[in-house]
Amino acid sequence: MKILVTGGTVFVSRFTAEYFAKNNEVYVLNRGTKSQSEGVHAIVCDRHELGDTLKKHEFDAVLDICGYNETDVRDLLGGLGNFGTYIFVSSSAVYPETRSQPFREKDEIGENKIWGDYGVNKINAERFLMANCKNAYIIRPPYLYGKMNNLYREAFVFECAEQNRPFFVPRDGKMRLQFFDIEDMCRFMEILLEQQPKQRVFNVGNPESVSVIEWVELCYKTLGKTQEFRFVEPNIEQRSYFPFYNYEYFLNVEKMLELMNETKSMEEGLKQSYAWFKDNRAEVRRKSYFEFIDKDLRG
């Protein structure tokens, strides 16, 4: 297949481009500000200034990894020539935090006060796409992790483990987190392209969540380390020392499992993530968690 991937230089879009390039002809659309992956064809252009750049291409699939709002989708659709299937990577942030959980695809979407404009913009992008593209799919992942993850999430815990630090846990550490390995997401997009199911919107993610404590234990275990926990009172801002908001949610992924009944174990996914991290530390966008911990929590 001839596939267009938006982005292609960082984490989700880069992994996606390299994953599909193994067996397909892959083009990436980006502004050329970062290094390009080997084995892909780079189209260096702003998605908002496409002109006729893409008109000469006929893509079997468009994987829109970097669409964040209605304008992003509108401008890309307007710049494309003929194409087959359009897959838009949306987010769990489209579900209001006030709705009962687990969230299902049929549930009404709306503003989530935790995610704010990010979720609202994804909603507007989804609606424009479904109104203007006949063969489109939308996937809504929870927290993505795995190889090439440049966000300071598991990488932060890995560094705590490397330095034999105690880990500072929000409250009692029982808040649950739902993850999805980036390779599993690519596998599912591949299934959508191959099987073309009638359903158009899918929640994706691991069928089971983990508590904060369980997640940290898994990260330390990846390095063969045992963690020591320190529990932090709720009056201290959680994002000052921990990579996730104080917000627990869960996506129902039964429809995904009907098409892809196995997902990668967290143990395996974290092992692959750490192997990448060790060789690509400079790629990670660090936050000042250590500074806050050392100044305000350890003292």
Annotate each predicted stretch with a short phrase:
Residues 158-168, 175-210:
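Alpha-helical substrate-binding/gating segment
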Residues 126-148:
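Conserved beta-loop-beta element that borders a ligand/cofactor-binding pocket
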Residues 101-126, 151-155, 175-179, 209:
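Short-chain dehydrogenase/reductase
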Residues 57-103, 109, 113, 123-128:
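NAD(P)-cofactor binding segment of oxidoreductase domains
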Residues 3-22:
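N-terminal Rossmann NAD(P)H-binding glycine-rich loop of SDR-like oxidoreductase domains
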Residues 6, 146, 170-175, 202-210, ...:
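Glycine-rich Rossmann NAD(P)(H)-binding loop
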Residues 192-248, 281, 287-290, 294-298:
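Mid/C-terminal beta-alpha module of Rossmann-like enzyme folds, strongest
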